[in-house]
């Protein structure tokens, strides 16, 4: 236990917060072949593999995911939200942060309705998260 005098001389340091999606905070300088600090809310990438994965213990399903090589040359696993998708190898996608709690190693989401990813068909509620246009009545 430090004395008050010791705390006056050197106060307690608060822990620095680690990013939940560290890959989005890296840029890549292809001329110098080195990484740079470049924070961005989303990054563009190309699908290298599209498949399904089984979730952790209490849950049971086949969750859709894509292996994506981002514009900073890092490969990640990204979750494909919604029912049905049109992604295949070499599709260009937009990736945002946000983990999937029951899929180990999946810390990113693919943005529906952006670039090569289509929106979810027939969706009427919560459309903005799934890139669905307003239906004509």
Curated annotation (Swiss-Prot):
The segment annotated Disordered runs over 1-57, 118-137
Q: Name one GO biological process term.
A: translation
GO cellular component, as recorded: small ribosomal subunit
Q: Which PROSITE patterns match?
A: RIBOSOMAL_S12
Arranged from A to Z, the UniProt key words for this protein are: Methylation, Ribonucleoprotein, Ribosomal protein, RNA-binding, rRNA-binding, tRNA-binding
Listed SUPFAM superfamilies? Nucleic acid-binding proteins
Gene3D superfamilies reported in the protein's UniProt record: Nucleic acid-binding proteins (2.40.50.140)
**Pfam families cross-referenced by the UniProt entry:** Ribosom_S12_S23 (PF00164)
In-chain residues carrying the UniProt-annotated modification 3-methylthioaspartic acid: 102
Kindly list any coiled-coil regions of this protein.
Answer: none
Q: Name one GO molecular function term.
A: structural constituent of ribosome
Role this protein plays:
With S4 and S5 plays an important role in translational accuracy.
Subunit structure as annotated in this protein's UniProt entry: Part of the 30S ribosomal subunit. Contacts proteins S8 and S17. May interact with IF1 in the 30S initiation complex.
Family, similarity comment: Belongs to the universal ribosomal protein uS12 family.
**Protein name listed in UniProt:** Small ribosomal subunit protein uS12
Which source organism does the UniProt entry give? Staphylococcus haemolyticus (strain JCSC1435)
What lineage is this protein's organism placed in? Bacteria, Bacillati, Bacillota, Bacilli, Bacillales
